[in-house]
Amino acid sequence: MLFNRSLPAPAHPTSITTLNGSNLEYVDNYKYLGVWLDCKLSSQTHIKHLQYKMKSRISFLYRNKASFTHAAKHTLVKLTILPILDFGDVISKIASNTLLNKLDAVYHSAIRFVTKAPYTTHHCDLYTLVGWPSLHTHHQTHWFQVIYKSLLGKAPPYLSYWSP
């Protein structure tokens, strides 16, 4: 994949040959360690995949909602939906508000599943009902925790390499 932030899509390059003589395949999107990269280094592809993954899980939960108690719904969303949002949330630092609003909508849908709140319920009321922060606050808190751990020297090796 060649990265190019210019507006037109990059032309497919001539073949790139490795040291052992094999040709590399050109791809527009590539998943690396759970994060989707595209040739323009935008977060749109990653956010779309997150949105699809969360929607499919929430749909499954809604189809089987009669089988779950309130506590079970709360636990299921906490264990199946929230980790998707947490993994790779550093990408949200560079995402546009339009893309983040799409994740907010899915997050609100997950909260509505837990609380049985109608669609017209304001998002602030949803957060109060379930006792969770907004997605922005959640990501900001996680970001501050990463910075704090880095300062204490308890960051993962790939992050501590970049800290003083």
Give, region by region, the residue ranges found by the protein language model.
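Short intrinsically disordered coil segments
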Residues: 15-20, 47-52, 127, 160
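Short conserved micro-motifs at the rims of enzyme active sites and ligand-binding pockets
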Residues: 11-14, 44-47, 155-156
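Short, conserved micro-motifs composed of acidic
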Residues: 1-28
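Short, well-ordered loop/turn and helix-capping segments at boundaries between secondary-structure elements
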Residues: 6, 38, 42, 60, ...
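Residues in well-ordered beta-strands of folded domains
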Residues: 1-3, 18, 33-36, 144
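Short, charged alpha-helical motifs in flexible N/C-terminal segments and linkers
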Residues: 1, 99-164
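Basic, alpha-helical interaction scaffolds
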Residues: 21-91
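Charged boundary/loop elements
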Residues: 85-100, 104
